[in-house]
From Swiss-Prot:
The keyword Membrane applies. GO terms for cellular component: extracellular region; host cell plasma membrane; membrane. It comes from Hyaloperonospora arabidopsidis (strain Emoy2). Residues 247-269 are annotated as: W motif. A motif (RxLR-dEER) lies at residues 45-60. Secreted effector that confers enhanced plant susceptibility during both compatible and incompatible interactions between the pathogen and its host. Promotes the sexual reproduction of the pathogen in the plant host. The RxLR-dEER motif is required for the delivery of the effector to the host cell cytoplasm but does not bind phosphatidylinositol monophosphates. The C-terminal region (residues 247 to 269) consists of one W motif, a conserved motif found in already well characterized effectors that may be involved in the interaction with host proteins. It is found in: Secreted; Host cell membrane. Residues 1-24 form the signal peptide. Belongs to the RxLR effector family. This is RxLR effector protein 17. The keyword Membrane applies.
Amino acid sequence: MQSILWFALIASVVFLVLVDLASGLNGLETLSSGADVDELTTATRLLRAAHLDRKLSEERAFISGESIGSWWTKVTEWLRVKFELIIAYIKQLRVKSNDVKDDAATNDAAHAKDDAAANKAARAKDDASRATYEAARANYEAARAYDDATRAQDVAALEAARAIEATDIAAYTGANAEYEQSMFLNGFVKTIDLHNEKNAPIMTRLNKSLDEAKKSSTFREIADGVNESKVALVVHEKQDGYLLWILHLKWAVEAKSPKDVVERILKDLGTHDVPHLQERAEQVKKAYTIFLLYVERMSRATHPK
């Protein structure tokens, strides 16, 4: 039991010595780091001053040989000073801890303020960018609408030009067709004139029949005249395709409608060896149609209503 008490006493003394050294080192560190003496608490300064005064008094007494109190008084005084130093050190640590907390809170507030300012600036920048984008998009929409309107106008103008062109082409085609028909009929008349000498008997009979038909009360006599010359067609078939016109004139007289005549004539062209007429089938068709109209006109002139 006694050994335990001695061990506890020695441990306490060692602990107090270590604390004293730590507090002394902490004070030196504080002073060496440039910290202000005012940062220490008033109690700490008073305790350190009393401790130094006591040390100086002990040293003077030791030098002069004087004794200050008994041994037990010195020990209790030393312990009291150590405990007061410990309490002052703990208070100092608490003050530093509070200062650290205050600094942390201040830093957090400053960071929060900076973050809020940065977020506000970034949001303002985003709003400005969005406004710029919306303006650019509006300009694009306006430009596209203008392009669509311009394209619609161009299409309308193109359609109008095409309509005018189609009208011009139709007029040209009609005029050209009339010109071709006129030229073909002129050629047909010239062909008749050229063959008048070779086919004089046939033409004489045909012209005679036409003259008689103009004087008679019926147009059917033309068919009789052509029928009488049918023998001459067979005889002169190899000379020229012109002889077919005389036969077709007979068909035109006997037919009920120009359509029937055209179909019969085109069918007959396929059974005869007439190369120059087969190569110009379309022109022949037009010429026959005009020729049939000519025959109908003759019929109306001969038999007025």
